[in-house]
């Protein structure tokens, strides 16, 4: 259990993901590895 605690602590302490274009904080999705926010790539809610 100690190792699991260290892993979760590592991910909890990572800085917020920021857009490579404008620098705005990106709302992350578990399946997304993109680094550009929806505003910069002009994506609207579907």
Swiss-Prot record:
In terms of InterPro entries, this protein maps to: YhfH-like
Q: What is this protein called?
A: Uncharacterized protein YhfH
Q: Which organism is it from?
A: Bacillus subtilis (strain 168)
